[in-house]
Design a protein with these regions (language model features):
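Surface-exposed polar/charged interaction patches
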Residues: 33-36, 40, 65, 83
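Short, cationic-aromatic polyanion-contact patches
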Residues: 56, 91-102
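Short acidic, hydrophobic short linear motifs in intrinsically disordered regions
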Residues: 42-61
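Long, low-complexity, charged/polar intrinsically disordered regions in eukaryotic proteins
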Residues: 1-38
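Eukaryotic partner-binding/assembly regions in large regulatory complexes
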Residues: 1-5, 44-48, 68
Length: 102
């Protein structure tokens, strides 16, 4: 597990590179969660574009699947939001469709 101390001792560019290396696995995890939501919406004849997951649920999946700390999962989500890979409204997260899916 990655700890706060281990990350904070590295130079800033190394921290950013390490954080960016988590983009693809995190987006794959998010896509899997969104696919479940889309399937649920299809069952009830809902609009699949409304599929979204909560920030807490996404963080929990990152912690369980990729064994990162809660703090680091939050950093990954914040970084994805800053670069425009995801769209957040309130506590819900969607993929940014302009960027494209995996």
């Amino acid at each position: 597990m990655i700890t706060n101390k281990a990350i904070q001792k590295k130079p800033e560019h190394k921290q950013m590179m390490q954080l960016q290396s988590w983009y693809e696995p995190a987006l794959r995890t998010l896509e899997g969660l969104l696919e479940i939501r889309r399937a649920n919406l299809r069952k009830v004849k809902g609009d699949e574009k409304n599929a979204a997951v909560t920030r807490d649920e996404f963080m929990e999946m990152l912690m369980n699947e990729h064994r990162v700390s809660a703090w680091y999962a939050g950093e990954i989500i914040s970084s994805l939001l800053r670069v425009g890979q995801i769209f957040m409204f309130g506590r819900f997260i969607q993929m940014n469709e302009e960027v494209g899916e995996l």
